[in-house]
Amino acid sequence: MQNRHIAMGILLLSLLLSSWLYWGSDFKLEQVLTSREWQSKMVSLIKTNSNRPAMGPLSRVDVTSNVKYLPNGTYLRVSIVKLFSDDNSAESVINISEFGEWDISDNYLLVTPVEFKDISSNQSKDFTDEQLQLITQLFKMDAQQSRRVDIVNERTILFTSLSHGSTVLFSNS
């Protein structure tokens, strides 16, 4: 009888320790990240003091992204970057397809972009090729940030960057 109580105590202790390790480990984050396709939307307002900044007459940028983190450690992201000029009437669109590798370490998502493709079909009238390349380069630099990952709920994840604030990823599926 006493051996049975000892065995039950060891089993309960093992169960508690295992669940604590599971919920506190990177494995849970990996499971949530790979479980579905994630979306995000970001709006940036740009104020400049000069008449013709390096990025042209840019006043606002809207970025809508869909990303899928795959169990093999790679990811695919498709982003639609809408550029608005100072008068807010003309809109230029850059479609960017991104492929890379990802890893989780101590609740931080480490992303290494491997390939970017501009899959846009039209060119802008308000922005020169050099300005569009600069904007695309800034987008690529932002993709290389490491971010802390917090699970808000099963359909919402919070990414916190060390320098650029936070991003919420959500899933409708």
Swiss-Prot record:
Claim: Secreted is one of the keywords in the record: no
Spans through the membrane: 6-25
Residues in the Cytoplasmic compartment per record: 1-5
UniProt topology in membrane: Single-pass membrane protein
Ranges facing Periplasmic side: 26-173
Chief place of localization: membrane
Cellular component, GO, one term: plasma membrane
Pfam families: ToxS (PF17323)
Keywords: Cell membrane, Membrane, Transmembrane, Transmembrane helix
InterPro entries in the record: ToxS
Keyword Zinc belongs to the record: no
Localization annotation: Cell membrane
Purpose of the protein: Interacts with ToxR and stimulates its activity.
Assembly, per entry: Interacts with the C-terminal periplasmic domain of ToxR, possibly by binding and stabilizing spontaneously forming ToxR dimers.
Name of the protein this chain belongs to: Transmembrane regulatory protein ToxS
